[in-house]
C-alpha cells in the first residue's frame, strides 16, 4: 500500500484533479443527456478507456522519467517497478471510473453496473497496456499518448471494417459501433488477452540489457612524437 501511495505521490496533484474533473463531467453528461442516448458505451467503452491510456502515458512514465537511469541502476529488476507504477495509476483511474458508474446508475436507473464494468475494464486495460509498452520501449515523452490517441481515432473511423469476418472479435468499441452478432463479451475477453500479451512482451524487453555501443577508447589523432617533450 505504501508503494502505491508513493507512486501516486510521484504522479503529482494534476493527476487526481484531472481525473476527478472527467468523472464530474461524465456524471453531468449522464444527468443532462436524453433517455435515447446509449450512455454506457460512450462513457465507459470510448471515453474513459482513452483517458486511462493517457493517464498511463503521461503520469506512469517509464523510460521518459528523468530518474529512469538512477531507478534502473538501483533496482534489481525494472519490470516490477514498471508494473507497480502502472498499477497505481490504472487502479486510481479505475476507482474513479467505478465511482462514476455508481453515480450514473443512480441518475439513470436503467444502467447495469456489471455491464459498465465489462465495457470499461478490458478496453481500458488494452489501451493502457499499449501505452505501457510504448513507454517502456521509448524515452520520448508523450509518445505513448500519441500512439494510443491515434489507435483510438483510427478504430473509431474504421467501423466499416466490422463487415469483415473476425474483425468484431478484436474491435475495441464493439458495443458503441453496434454488436450485430452478440459477441461483445468474446471481444472484451480477446482485448484482455491481447493486453496480457503486451505485458509479457514488455516483461521480456524491459530486462533486456542495452546493446553496447562502439568503443571510442582509441584516440582520433595520434600525438606527434616530435611534439612530445
Region locations from a protein language model:
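Short helix-to-coil transition segments within interhelical loops
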Residues: 70-79
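Transmembrane helix segments
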Residues: 141-180
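Hydrophobic alpha-helical transmembrane segments
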Residues: 1-45, 50-62, 125, 136, ...
Amino acid at each position: 500500500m505504501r508503494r502505491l501511495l508513493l507512486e501516486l505521490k510521484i504522479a503529482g496533484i494534476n493527476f487526481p484533479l484531472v481525473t476527478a474533473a472527467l468523472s464530474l463531467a461524465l456524471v453531468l453528461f449522464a444527468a443532462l443527456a436524453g433517455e435515447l442516448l446509449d450512455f454506457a458505451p460512450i462513457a465507459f467503452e470510448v471515453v474513459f478507456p482513452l483517458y486511462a491510456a493517457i493517464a498511463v502515458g503521461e503520469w506512469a512514465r517509464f523510460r521518459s522519467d528523468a530518474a529512469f537511469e538512477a531507478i534502473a541502476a538501483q533496482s534489481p529488476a525494472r519490470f516490477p517497478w514498471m508494473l507497480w507504477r502502472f498499477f497505481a495509476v490504472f487502479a486510481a483511474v479505475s476507482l474513479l471510473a467505478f465511482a462514476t458508474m455508481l453515480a450514473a446508475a443512480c441518475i439513470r436507473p436503467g444502467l447495469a453496473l456489471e455491464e459498465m464494468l465489462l465495457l470499461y475494464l478490458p478496453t481500458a486495460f488494452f489501451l493502457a497496456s499499449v501505452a505501457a509498452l510504448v513507454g517502456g520501449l521509448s524515452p520520448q515523452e508523450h509518445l505513448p499518448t500519441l500512439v494510443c490517441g491515434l489507435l483510438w481515432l483510427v478504430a473509431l473511423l474504421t467501423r466499416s471494417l466490422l463487415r469483415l469476418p473476425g474483425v468484431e472479435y478484436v474491435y475495441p468499441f464493439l458495443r458503441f459501433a453496434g454488436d450485430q452478432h452478440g459477441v461483445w463479451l468474446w471481444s472484451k475477453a480477446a482485448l484482455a488477452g491481447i493486453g496480457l500479451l503486451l505485458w509479457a512482451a514488455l516483461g521480456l524487453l524491459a530486462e533486456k540489457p542495452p546493446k553496447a555501443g562502439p568503443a571510442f577508447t582509441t584516440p582520433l589523432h595520434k600525438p606527434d612524437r616530435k611534439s612530445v617533450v
